[in-house]
């Protein structure tokens, strides 16, 4: 039966294709590879791109864009759409990578990879450009339907769930799509474009979607990029090994020169050609894969496409940073006798591949921009999806072992020991799950060796105390970070936000490096479900190790109590691992505690110790709404089951008496009995322990809701939240304070948020993503 249905659908598609060919000619995928910049009243860069960015790329931006249609660049639009999902929890074989600007160099190449056009690739005339293009047809379909102006959208007609079935019609399938889903024009599930924006896009499409030549890189930017390329392509073995290490840690970075007035972002890529020649990209699934060339050159390529909040990771380059890197990697007295191989047993283990580089040098590179380092895990492709990200708690702090503390000598030994500990990186098949016990044994053996070393080192003045924590050298706010998980995504910010997190982690070089290679450099978003589960399971060990480091700062007699609270009702194998690991460290803390709540006390001492370098950006005391500070703190302090009805991440706009808008982020921190199980997270939820965190400004890339109120409504808003006892109660609160998907002011409000974001933090700002926006 299924075969007959498939055969019928294929026949219908072939017939539709024949009809289109008869009317508008044969499709030519190369048509937009070198588009003509024909005279047109509409400019792509001046008129069209601002619309496709603010109305289209906010849902169609990256790997998780519906149908892989990325609309943040001209090349993304001309590439088109695919029916294959990047994030597929059931994938048993590796998927061919589909990275824009990387895995195909022409639209014909993308057609061979299964992408279908959304622009007209047939004969170019006004009628064909409208009738034979999916994008034009979707815009027209939206304009033909009346969209609700209030209330909720029908759950029967609109599915906003993360793993919903996608409809990715080709032009041959579009008539059937429009007949079956007349309300599914674009933007999907959001208000239609304004008449002016609609006409701008229609006129551009009618003209054949012309585009101007790309703007050349400014001479000052070009020269500065050349200086860094020269630095990263030295001939000595030392310089080559340094460059390889830097690349494997910066490959996701958006590099910029912070002392130049113009802002251009670059990405570090591997090339077959040296500086001064056109880049010939070396493409590979992972940054440490064999480049298949005698010499790799590291080049700076301008970032193409719109910056997205969920992937934008700015990293400043300047002469001071170059000098520091040179002092760590070149001036340091060590010898590089040969370059490491790219074989899996070497390349997949950074403690083997870079053993010749002093550990302190490696640690310093990661530590100096620790937020960026952790952001690779948080913003990298691993963190899309609940199963991938539920390995961490909803709200925790991160600190780092001081690179110059005597305890680092033991870290050197541990880094050497990790040459024998494998990460589950390269294996993709189901059989690799059978090796899980082997990984567990290796980790247990490593922790025993670590405990032996620490028990010897943590004596006298070296007993665990706050001097062991890196203080940012007195001026670096990367010394302390806070992570917020929002169900299936997360955010990391500088500072110790809030008064007491759910848990915390302290990392030294070995742990930081392993997390990077497990979840950033070694993670394959196009890999199998087995590979992704292995990474998630192994991260359990690494998270526990970071928490184990925190427990060492507590009195011996308090450690079990705190640990058991973090791991309530955890599986027996997890508890056995925890008890074994924790019992191995018997040295007491060097901190003198004055209360019977040492975990709470430690959080306060930690904040006090790092106060000179803590980033206070997310402290409510800095808000301009000083007259309402008490109410804001009251909202921030709410906890319990009532707050569990709120979305994970909401942006609140509060207008003062002068009608000045002030933006805040409200985060719901979901409590769990433990985070050491893969599935059925809802069974481990503890809604009575949920808390809220309110911070000034915008934090996070995936808002679930927008709230708008004036400052005089704050008491009522807080009262209504306190009284939430059902989904129906939340619907009433939303009806009063939320800007829902159906609100005609939705786009104007989104524009105001983006304008505020760019105006306040122009370097880090990127487009927000509305794929998780609620319909409640």
Enumerate the predicted regions with their spans.
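Aromatic- and Gly/Pro-enriched helix-to-coil junctions and flexible linker segments
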Residues: 13-776
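C-terminal motif of bacterial Sec signal peptides marking the signal peptidase cleavage site
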Residues: 8-11
């Amino acid at each position: 039966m299924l075969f007959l249905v498939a055969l019928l659908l294929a026949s219908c598609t072939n017939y539709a294709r024949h009809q289109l060919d008869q009317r508008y000619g044969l499709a030519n995928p190369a048509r937009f590879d070198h588009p003509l910049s024909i005279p047109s009243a509409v400019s792509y860069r001046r008129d069209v791109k601002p619309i496709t960015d603010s109305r289209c790329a906010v849902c169609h931006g990256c790997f998780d864009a519906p149908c892989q249609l990325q609309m943040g660049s001209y090349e993304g639009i001309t590439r088109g759409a695919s029916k294959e999902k990047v994030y597929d929890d059931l994938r048993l074989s590796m998927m061919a990578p589909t990275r824009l600007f990387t895995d195909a160099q022409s639209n014909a190449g993308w057609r061979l990879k299964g992408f279908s056009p959304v622009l007209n690739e047939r004969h170019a005339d006004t009628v064909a450009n409208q009738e034979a293009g999916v994008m034009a047809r979707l815009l027209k379909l939206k304009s033909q339907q009346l969209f609700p102006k209030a209330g909720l959208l029908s759950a029967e007609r609109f599915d906003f769930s993360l793993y919903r079935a996608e409809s990715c019609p080709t032009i041959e399938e579009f008539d059937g799509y429009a007949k079956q889903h007349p309300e599914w024009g674009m933007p999907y599930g959001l208000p239609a474009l304004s008449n002016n924006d609609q006409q701008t896009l229609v006129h551009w499409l009618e003209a054949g979607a012309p585009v101007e030549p790309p703007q050349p890189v400014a001479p000052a930017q070009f020269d500065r990029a050349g200086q860094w390329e020269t630095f990263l392509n030295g001939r000595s073995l030392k310089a080559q090994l340094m460059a390889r290490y830097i690349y494997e840690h910066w490959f996701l970075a958006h590099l910029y020169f912070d002392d130049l007035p113009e802002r251009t972002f670059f990405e570090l890529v591997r090339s077959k050609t040296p500086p001064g020649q056109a880049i010939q990209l070396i493409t590979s699934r992972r940054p440490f894969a064999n480049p298949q060339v005698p010499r790799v050159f590291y080049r700076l390529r301008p970032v193409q496409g719109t910056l997205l909040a969920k992937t934008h990771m700015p990293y400043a380059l300047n002469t001071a940073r170059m000098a520091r890197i040179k002092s760590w990697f070149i001036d340091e007295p060590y010898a590089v006798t040969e370059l490491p191989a790219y074989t899996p047993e070497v390349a997949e283990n950074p403690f083997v591949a870079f053993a010749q580089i002093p550990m302190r040098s490696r640690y310093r590179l990661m530590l100096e921009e620790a937020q960026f380092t952790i952001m690779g895990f948080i913003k990298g492709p691993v963190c899309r999806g609940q199963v991938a990200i539920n390995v961490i708690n909803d709200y925790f702090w991160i600190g780092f072992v001081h690179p110059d503390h005597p305890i680092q000598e033991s870290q050197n030994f541990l880094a050497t020991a990790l040459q024998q500990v494998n990460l589950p990186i390269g294996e993709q098949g189901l059989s690799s799950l059978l090796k899980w016990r082997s990984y567990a044994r290796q980790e247990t053996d490593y922790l025993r060796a670590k405990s032996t070393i620490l028990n010897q080192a943590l004596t006298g003045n070296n007993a665990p105390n706050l001097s062991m924590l890196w203080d940012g050298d007195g001026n670096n706010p990367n010394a302390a970070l806070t992570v917020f998980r929002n169900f299936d995504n997360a955010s990391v910010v500088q500072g110790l936000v809030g008064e007491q997190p759910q848990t915390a982690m302290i990392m030294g070089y070995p742990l930081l490096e392993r997390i990077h290679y497990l979840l950033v450099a070694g993670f394959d978003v196009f890999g199998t479900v087995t590979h992704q589960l292995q990474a998630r399971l192994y991260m359990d060990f690494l998270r526990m190790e970071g928490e184990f480091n925190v427990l060492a700062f507590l009195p011996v007699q308090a450690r079990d109590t705190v640990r058991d609270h973090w791991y309530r009702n955890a599986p027996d194998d997890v508890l056995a691992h925890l008890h074994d690991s924790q019992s191995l460290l018997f040295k007491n803390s060097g901190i003198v505690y004055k209360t019977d709540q040492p975990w709470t006390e430690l959080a306060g001492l930690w904040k006090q110790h790092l106060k000179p370098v803590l980033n206070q950006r997310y402290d409510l005391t800095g808000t301009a709404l000083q007259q309402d500070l008490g109410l804001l703190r009251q909202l921030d302090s709410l906890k319990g089951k009532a707050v569990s009805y709120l979305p994970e991440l909401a942006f609140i706009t509060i207008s003062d008496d002068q009608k000045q808008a002030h933006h805040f982020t409200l985060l719901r921190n979901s409590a769990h009995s433990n985070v050491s199980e893969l599935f059925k997270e809802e069974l481990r939820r503890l809604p009575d322990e949920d808390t809220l965190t309110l911070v000034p400004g915008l934090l996070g890339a995936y808002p679930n809701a927008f709230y708008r109120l004036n400052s005089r409504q704050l008491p009522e808003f807080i009262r209504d939240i306190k009284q939430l006892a059902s989904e129906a109660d939340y619907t009433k609160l939303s009806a009063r304070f939320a800007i829902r998907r159906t609100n005609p002011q939705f786009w104007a409000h989104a524009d105001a948020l983006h304008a505020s974001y760019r105006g306040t933090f122009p370097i880090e700002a990127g487009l927000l993503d509305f794929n998780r926006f609620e319909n409640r």
